[in-house]
UniProtKB/Swiss-Prot annotation:
Protein name (record): Large ribosomal subunit protein bL17
Lineage of source species: Bacteria, Bacillati, Bacillota, Clostridia, Thermoanaerobacterales
Complex formation: Part of the 50S ribosomal subunit. Contacts protein L32.
Top-rank taxon, per record: Bacteria
Keywords noted in UniProt: Ribonucleoprotein, Ribosomal protein
GO BP field: translation
GO molecular function: structural constituent of ribosome
GO cellular component: cytosolic large ribosomal subunit
A Pfam match: Ribosomal_L17
Length: 112
């Protein structure tokens, strides 16, 4: 599968996505651009699947990507058990319309 470049060098893109995924799992919903939200959805769904696995290796893999240890704890103890009977599709993207400054399409991404 391909990926979006999001107009940044790879190190900046990775850092931005790690921050977005961490905040998304921390707060349960964030407002961002559509392209970023689609990337965040892909990564966060994989993180929730790791949380459902629940073993030590899965926890360490999540810690390698998510910046805040308390968010990993929340992922494994609160978020993942909520989706134990669901096979993917843990997130929802709602369109908001264009951003005032540059017209970029804004969306809300939230946990279902």
């Amino acid at each position: 599968m391909g990926y979006r470049k999001l107009g940044r060098p790879s190190d900046q893109r990775r850092a931005m996505l790690r921050n977005l995924v961490t905040d998304f799992l921390k707060y349960g919903r964030i407002t961002t651009t559509e392209a970023r939200a689609k990337e965040v959805r892909s990564i966060s769904e994989k993180m929730i699947t790791l949380g459902k696995r629940g073993d030590l290796h899965a926890r360490r893999q999540a810690l390698a990507y998510i910046l805040d240890e308390s968010v990993v704890k929340k992922l494994f103890d609160e978020i993942a058990p909520k989706y134990k009977d669901r096979q993917g599709g843990y997130t929802r993207i709602l369109k908001l319309g264009p951003r005032r400054g540059d017209g970029a399409p804004l969306v809300i991404i939230e946990l279902v």
